[in-house]
Amino acid sequence: MWWFRRRDRAPLRATSSLSLRWRVMLLAMSMVAMVVVLMSFAVYAVISAALYSDIDNQLQSRAQLLIASGSLAADPGKAIEGTAYSDVNAMLVNPGQSIYTAQQPGQTLPVGAAEKAVIRGELFMSRRTTADQRVLAIRLTNGSSLLISKSLKPTEAVMNKLRWVLLIVGGIGVAVAAVAGGMVTRAGLRPVGRLTEAAERVARTDDLRPIPVFGSDELARLTEAFNLMLRALAESRERQARLVTDAGHELRTPLTSLRTNVELLMASMAPGAPRLPKQEMVDLRADVLAQIEELSTLVGDLVDLSRGDAGEVVHEPVDMADVVDRSLERVRRRRNDILFDVEVIGWQVYGDTAGLSRMALNLMDNAAKWSPPGGHVGVRLSQLDASHAELVVSDRGPGIPVQERRLVFERFYRSASARALPGSGLGLAIVKQVVLNHGGLLRIEDTDPGGQPPGTSIYVLLPGRRMPIPQLPGATAGARSTDIENSRGSANVISVESQSTRAT
């Protein structure tokens, strides 16, 4: 035994990469860490340069003080020994190579190549850092050389503490940035999370409820756009469901009647069954053919409506004069007892050829249906401005009451008087759909206001442009209007351009 059940929809595939929240948080951490590192290097470099510059200034000041006091010349040994009570090391080298030194406990003033060059008189002054000391050597005017150094251990201790402070403060800054970035990202991406949950909800349950909108930023606009999409999807589903329901209702009546007639025909042809009179058989067969024609028309209308709802149209330049001519020929084959007064211009619409043809055909069919035998139907296509033309289809029928003029464009709507005539109630609905899809407008007015009958005129505003008029050989400026009554039979057609012009 086979059991059928509804297939559950596959869940949305989870991505293996980092979430947007984590990516934003990591980006914030990286940026803050980069800024902290750059600032730490800058602070360290500035403070280090300042401390070492201060040491150089201290050594320079101490040397100038010794030189200016004159003690080096009067009693160099005592002068140098006096420096032992300060925080520097000193050495005086006289021209006779007598050396006086005073050094801090545990320290030795280093003498290198730079200092020896000063002693030999090759350099006037030198500065260098060596063996944790900063050394200054100066050549005096009497030929002596003064060497002074200071330990860098206190400075290095300060710099070491500064490094730890910068490391700790930078780490705290990165951590705070990570926490703050996570909080801001979580709050900022909350609308995105709601959108994701709504999309997953729609995929799982077909629930099209809108999402609450908070604020007026970009994410709020994204939420509003998503809500618009949900509303459009809900309207599309509602139209689809209504179309299926209405189509089922409209198809049921002709199908039931057709089935009854076919069963009656089959029963009358069964062996031993009573035969129907010949005229009844003829009427029954004609009724079956009429019902089949009605079903074909209804199915065609439904296909056109669903095609327009789905947006399955190919847009191309369309010559409306040619559309009117072709539609007129089709209507005349069904109603050759109607006189058509047609006045058209060469107008080009960028749109769907099949849809525009069906729109024009339905308007003329509707006007012919409500016109008495021998009546007149007017079809006029005229230019209103540089980018708009107006198609008007008029009849002399009973007219449409004002309260029903909006309803006649609804699907399957049929007034009480229209139910006695053939039709599915979809013709003007298709007209409305095609016109709106092409950016046009519709309105209904009486052909003869106050007249009996008033008639009906349907006005269609179509955007487009005037078609260029090619000059034919031998044509004169006045030959702009051609009466093609003979080519139309009973149709009286007056065209602004000649028939041959529109056919090109």
Curated annotation (Swiss-Prot):
SUPFAM superfamilies: ATPase domain of HSP90 chaperone/DNA topoisomerase II/histidine kinase, HAMP domain-like, Homodimeric domain of signal transducing histidine kinase. GO terms for biological process: phosphorelay signal transduction system. Induction: Induced by MprA. Differentially up-regulated under different stress conditions, such as low concentrations of detergents and alkaline pH. Induced by low concentrations of sodium dodecyl sulfate (SDS) in a SigE-dependent manner. In strain ATCC 25618 / H37Rv, repressed during growth in macrophages. Highly up-regulated during the early stages of invasion of the human blood-brain barrier. Its EC number is 2.7.13.3, 3.1.3.-. Deletion experiments show that amino acids 95-133 are required for activation of MprA. It comes from Mycobacterium tuberculosis (strain ATCC 25618 / H37Rv). This is Signal transduction histidine-protein kinase/phosphatase MprB. Residues 1-26, 185-504 are cytoplasmic. PROSITE patterns: HAMP, HIS_KIN. It is a multi-pass membrane protein.
